[in-house]
Amino acid sequence: MTTTMNRLPVSTWNPLGVNYAPASAALPAVPAAGWAKAEALSPALPAGVTAPAAADFGSFAASGMGAETDAWLAANANLVNHLAVTGTADAPVVFETALDTDHPHALTYLTIDAAAGSSLTVVQVVRGDAEDGISANLTRIRAAEGAHVVLVQVQLLGNRARRWNAVAIEQGTSARVEQVRIELGGSVVACGARTLLNHNKCEYDLDAVYFGHSNDVLDFNDVSVHTGRDTLCEMHTAGVLTGSADKILRGTVDFQRGAKRGVGHESEDVLLFSPSARNRTAPLILCGEEEVEGQHAASVGRLDENKLYYLRSRGLSEAQARRLMVDARFAPAIDKIPLDSLQDEVRENVARRLNDELDG
């Protein structure tokens, strides 16, 4: 499908090619026979959490991927889940999907309605490497006054699958939403998160990591819109690019009029393992209010040969030294995964990808 996704809120010089996602990241065409049935494990629901048959999110804010992409994802979903939480959930709700020969398509739509003062952690995991596999996800979060929602997304696809991941968030007064986004596989990865901090003292945290290799195309667009007073946003991303991977990250902190004493920080730390890898970063801070604090930072570099030599002189192999450097960058996000076994799986996946690059 041809649509403009991951659009930068304010366009920059067009020849840079960062104003929106490239054509190579376009949404997939709907198969003539329709989408294959998805396979998923039904999650256990802790006390205070229910799964209603329907939810009213029809006029919800757009994700970072854009309203048109959101509409397509919702209309084409072959797995739909709604969660409502009214208390403090004592265990995470875990959604697991797998792409395989019989189930190559997982198009998921999840809504989370967190009532005032409630607390919930949701984990979304997708695995598999079906031929022409498709993983497409739309998650919408409504966090009422004082609610706390943690969304952990872990993507462990193989190299033949493609991935789209949209997140839209609306927050009430003093609400807090934390998002962890780990994207390690897929030949095409396009993600966009957008949160509306339109009430006083609400907070949003994003910790994201990605791994691009071979000819992967990675495209990200993360936006925090501040209209309430005393709002806080922290968006931090770490990535590794190898082979001829091509990555664009747009990170926007938008302070609109009335967002007094708003604070927004965004940063990216990219490690390049190949001279053929292409990295583009478009940090953007928009100020419609004077009394705000906005900061952005981007660090792009290659392996420090002195550090590598030091680690190898202490008995580490080159693969172990590289893994240590990557682990240090990825740890803030991985450590937030509430399941120890999933943390281990993510670290093993990263180590395997690094080893494959060295062997290649």
Where do the language-model regions lie?
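Active-site regions of enzymes building and remodeling cell-envelope glycoconjugates
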Residues: 32-57
